[in-house]
Design a protein with these regions (language model features):
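Active-site and adjacent substrate-binding regions of carbohydrate-active enzymes
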Residues: 1-350
Length: 350
């Protein structure tokens, strides 16, 4: 039920829609589902599967209308199912009206909604590298300055040092909570605040991350959102976190912190990789179990998950052990995969 672009069947395959989810609510209720997390259904040019939002207050026509969304919330509530939306507040689409205004001129009131810098001696403002590889800077020909994008160049980062950005996001959160949603899954939430724009230590991945990963400014933002918005509603927040330790996770979701309720960590999803699913190493079950036990013992409320839009199917990925397709054709492989599927199901549902 997490991914609305699968199997709804009311649009041409493989795209689904909100009406399709509504049609499956009885089935989901029968399964015992209590929460449906919707990946982004906002208006978007879909450079990054909806994580590039061009309008936070409307529904992408492919998925339906605001009326469909209100009906989904209402019908789900009748079945004691809550709706959680994706919240993407590190960046917007470059087609969002804020960014269109921002890039139009240095003196535009929306200029400081984003992070703009001039180049240095014909070079980019710093040496940071993107989550999607390559530099984080894109030169805009209108003013000759560069804008920061930790992800795609179509996803300019918001400037959380600007109080107006906070006010805009507070208003958006209230808009959806007043409509009746039950909370938010907060996308890459621990990278939203950039303490400085200095050059970073050169790394295999994410050069510059020491200037934006889990900064104190991020904690201040989350506490302010909790104080001014979330505490006024019966709602739930879970943060997707990047490269965090259990101690760092507790700083985000510890009961006394007043920030998030829960975190999604990637640690157990790195049992066959090195801090990045593209840097593969042989899978070892003991590595997976060790990480799960560590986080279970040390983190207040860690999400128990294996799959989402970022992760391949677990049984195929971990169950084949070497990760090679030909492993699946070996004698006994089918039985081994079935046992692994049962094991992961037990871990998720008990």
């Amino acid at each position: 039920a997490e991914r609305e672009q699968v199997g709804a069947g009311l649009l041409a395959a493989p795209l689904g829609d909100l009406k399709g989810i509504i049609s499956k609510l009885d089935y989901l209720a029968d399964l015992g589902i209590g929460i449906i997390w919707l990946s982004p259904v906002y208006c978007s040019p879909n450079d990054d599967n909806g994580y590039d939002i061009s309008d936070y207050r409307n529904i992408h026509p492919d998925f339906g209308t605001l009326s469909d969304m209100k009906r989904l919330i209402s019908e789900a509530k009748k079945r004691d199912i809550k709706i959680v939306m994706d919240l993407v507040i590190n960046h917007t689409s470059d087609e969002h009206e804020w960014f269109k205004q921002s890039r139009s001129g240095i003196d535009n009131p929306y200029r400081d909604y984003y992070i703009w810098q001039s180049g240095k001696d014909g070079k980019m403002p710093n040496n940071w590298t993107s989550f999607f590889s390559g530099p984080v800077w894109e030169k805009d020909e209108t003013t000759g300055q560069y804008y920061l994008h930790l992800f795609s160049k179509k996803q300019p980062d918001l400037n959380w040092k600007n109080p107006k950005v906070m006010q805009e996001i507070q208003s958006i959160l209230k808009y959806w909570l007043d409509m009746g949603i039950a909370g938010f899954r907060c996308d890459v939430i621990n990278v939203i605040y950039k303490t400085s724009l200095k050059n970073g230590k050169k790394r295999l991945i994410l050069t510059g991350r020491e200037h934006y990963l889990s900064q104190q400014g991020c904690h201040s933002i989350l506490r302010e959102l909790r104080r001014t918005v979330f505490s006024n509603y019966d709602c739930f927040t879970v943060g997707e976190t990047v490269l965090v330790t259990p101690a760092m996770a507790n700083d985000l979701c510890g009961e006394s912190r007043g920030e998030l309720d829960m975190v999604f960590s990637f640690a157990h999803m790195d049992a066959d990789s090195i801090n990045n699913k593209w840097l593969k190493i042989p899978f070892k079950p003991e590595r997976l179990f060790s990480v799960l036990a560590k986080w279970q013992n040390e983190v207040g409320w860690n999400a128990n998950y294996f799959e989402n839009h970022d992760q391949p199917r677990t049984v195929s990925r971990y169950g084949s052990f070497t990760g090679k397709v030909d492993e699946l054709n070996k004698p006994g492989a089918k039985d081994a995969l079935e046992r692994f599927a049962k094991l992961t199901a037990c871990m998720l549902f008990t």
